């Protein structure tokens, strides 16, 4: 993921065809080490492809995953958890705000604000 992020930053920054050295420089600038074999494999797979096409392809794959998932049986449990969380919220003591004289830190007169 770090390689793809660095590649995308370079493309969005105006470098239409980032090299392995370009990606390494970006990663090194934020203190991340890179593995040459993984970087070479990524650049080989991305060769000749536009970033916006890759993003569209990835988005369609992600949306197909969420569309195929059916509802889980966790809806009833979520309702029970909400009741428990509500009970916890009621138990918290509320703190009152105190009028505190801040020692006239803004240089005004001695009146209370």
Swiss-Prot record:
Alphabetically ordered keywords of this record: Phosphoprotein, Ribonucleoprotein, Ribosomal protein
CDD domains the UniProt entry points to: Ribosomal_P2
One Gene Ontology CC term in the entry: cytosolic large ribosomal subunit
GO annotation, biological process: cytoplasmic translational elongation
Superkingdom of the organism of origin: Eukaryota
The keyword Ribonucleoprotein belongs to this UniProt entry's keyword annotation: yes
Start-end of Low complexity biased regions: 74-85
Region spans: Disordered: 60-113
Biased composition (Acidic residues): 88-99
Entry comment on modification after translation: Phosphorylated.
InterPro entries xref list: P1/P2_N_sf (IPR038716), Ribosomal_P1/P2 (IPR027534), Ribosomal_P2 (IPR044076)
GO molecular function: structural constituent of ribosome
Assembly and interaction partners: P1 and P2 exist as dimers at the large ribosomal subunit.
PANTHER family for this protein: 60S ACIDIC RIBOSOMAL PROTEIN FAMILY MEMBER, LARGE RIBOSOMAL SUBUNIT PROTEIN P2
Primary role: Plays an important role in the elongation step of protein synthesis.
HAMAP family named in the record: Ribosomal_L12_arch
Family of the protein in this entry: Belongs to the eukaryotic ribosomal protein P1/P2 family.
Name under which the protein is recorded: Large ribosomal subunit protein P2
Organism: Euplotes raikovi
UniProt lineage: Eukaryota, Sar, Alveolata, Ciliophora, Intramacronucleata
